[in-house]
A protein has these predicted regions:
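Ser/Thr-rich, low-complexity intrinsically disordered terminal regions
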Residues: 3-27, 31-44
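Long, charge-dense
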Residues: 114-117
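Long, contiguous binding/interaction regions
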Residues: 107-112
Length: 126
């Protein structure tokens, strides 16, 4: 799905359907209006059970120390949903296909980390 964010940035959104063992993954790639970067996001990677907020903060801090290229966090005021984030910077002289390739490689890295970290987080925080 191609669209624009509330701020007017171009965005590509992908949703991978879950099965009995995995929830849906919402991948988002937001291209900055100035063309210098893209924000890669996996939305709602983990849902935190009621009363597990402190456990979630500790677990996310551990994930942030272990997985240096991806940030695990709560988006905005939502403290029940864990989001994964990565930013990709582009050089002014880069061709568009190279920028797209960096985004794909970044998402691939994020999905690999997601596959490793999220099952453990879901078990711990549900």
């Amino acid at each position: 799905l191609l669209g624009k964010t509330h701020g007017g940035d171009e965005a590509v959104s992908l949703v991978f359907g879950g099965d009995e063992d995995a929830a849906e993954l919402h991948l988002l790639c937001i291209f900055a209006q100035n063309g210098g970067s893209a924000a890669l996001r996996i939305l709602r990677a983990v849902q935190v059970a009621e009363g597990r907020h402190l456990d979630a903060l500790i677990a996310l801090q551990d994930c942030n120390a272990r997985y240096r290229f991806v940030k695990f966090c709560f988006p905005g005021e939502d403290e029940r949903s864990v989001q994964m984030e990565m930013d990709v910077l582009f050089l002014p002289e880069m061709r568009p296909d190279l920028c797209a390739d960096l985004c794909v490689k970044g998402m691939h890295l994020m999905l690999g980390i997601c596959a490793e970290a999220v099952p453990e987080l879901r078990q711990l925080l549900s």
